[in-house]
Design a protein with these regions (language model features):
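Residue-level detector of alpha-helical recognition elements and their boundaries
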Residues: 57, 115-116, 256
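Sequence/fold signature of self-assembling virion shell proteins
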Residues: 2-50, 60-78, 134, 175-293
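Long, contiguous amphipathic alpha-helices that act as assembly "spine/axial" helices in icosahedral shell
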Residues: 42, 64-124, 153-155, 159-162, ...
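Alpha-helical scaffold segments that mediate packing/assembly in large oligomeric complexes
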Residues: 84-152, 261-280, 284, 289-292
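Extended, solvent-exposed, turn-rich assembly/linker loops in the middle of proteins
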Residues: 122-191
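Residues that scaffold the ATP/ADP-binding catalytic core of kinase and kinase-like folds
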Residues: 52-53, 172
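Short, polar loop/linker segments at the starts of domains and inter-domain junctions
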Residues: 54-60, 101
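Short, catalytically relevant binding-site loops at active-site mouths
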Residues: 118-119, 167-171, 207, 293
């Protein structure tokens, strides 16, 4: 029977590889230091200490605080194939199958990731009830402000990201300080675009009307594919493949992320530019007489 030749590691590897290529959360989060069963451990390092030198040296122990996370979210997939053997031998069919399921899994994983990150964010510009009006003239500036919020908390300069949705990316594209033709890679990276030290990312899995800036140390995330198996289906003449994905996320540093609540403004929200011209002896306006006028 075809299912006797099923190779679970082959499918798991293909699924995870495709997942990594499309999940934005994997780029933004800290990976776990250790995974034991359904428990994940992240190590948070305490701040360093400087002392005045007076002829002797006192040694400090490196202090790490283990932060535990349980895989509290579980999703499964199950699909039927006419012949598992044939699909495993045809790389294009297997790639398409695993890529599609990896994309669906990544969407759910990223959506939960951003919801957790926002819930743990304390540095806010605007609020859910008082959103900032954003136009092409100030969209870039608000992202600069998010980066400034992180800098004021002394968040490390490297591994900073800011994630926007397609609407916000469109507003940025109309600002001369940004590119007018942004290229979004498969994993959400907006190629070559950095604002105030933050790599610009794009995702539609963000909470509505929110832009989030974060350092990788702000949140940890992990997932596992469990129970990958094949079986002969009784209800149809086909083989079935199913798998269970368990995952979770944990906010590690509340001061390492900042969020903007916004709504897209209209032309009426753009501040008018008033130019006042005076023409007197102190501030004369140079004019030129036109012959025959």
């Amino acid at each position: 029977m075809a299912v006797d030749n099923f190779k679970p590691t082959l499918w798991e590897g293909a699924l995870i590889a495709n997942f990594h290529s499309v999940s934005i959360a994997d780029v933004l989060a800290t990976p776990p230091a250790d995974i034991k069963g359904n428990k994940v451990i992240f190590n948070r390092i305490a701040g360093g200490t400087l002392k005045d030198y007076e002829g002797s040296v006192d040694w400090d122990e490196i202090d790490t605080t283990p932060v535990e996370m349980i895989f509290d979210k579980k999703k499964y997939f199950a699909f039927a194939l006419d012949d598992v053997d044939k699909v495993q031998l045809k790389a294009d069919v297997m790639t398409a199958t695993t890529k599609e399921h990896a994309a669906v899994l990544a969407e759910t994983y990223d959506k939960d990731f951003f919801a957790a990150l926002l819930a743990g964010t304390k540095l806010l510009i605007g609020s859910s009830s008082a959103k900032k009006k954003v136009t092409p003239l100030n969209a870039y500036d608000y992202i600069v402000d998010l980066g400034t919020q992180l800098s004021k908390k002394k968040v490390p300069k490297v591994n900073r990201f800011v994630t926007v949705n397609a609407d916000y990316l469109g507003l940025l594209s109309k600002d001369k300080r940004f590119t007018d033709n942004p290229k979004v890679l498969e994993n959400g990276v907006v190629e070559g675009q950095v604002i105030n030290g933050m790599q610009v990312m794009c995702s539609e899995e963000l909470p509505a009307n929110v832009v989030i800036a974060n350092h990788k140390s702000a949140i940890g995330a992990a997932k596992q594919i469990n129970e990958m198996e094949a079986m002969r289906l009784q209800s149809k003449f086909a083989d079935g493949i199913r798998g269970l994905c368990v995952y979770g996320d944990k906010v590690l540093r509340e001061d390492a992320s900042a969020a903007l609540y916004f709504e897209v403004g209209t032309a009426a929200d753009v501040d008018p530019i008033n130019v006042k011209i005076t023409n007197d002896t102190k501030n004369p306006v140079n004019t030129k007489e036109v012959a025959g006028a």
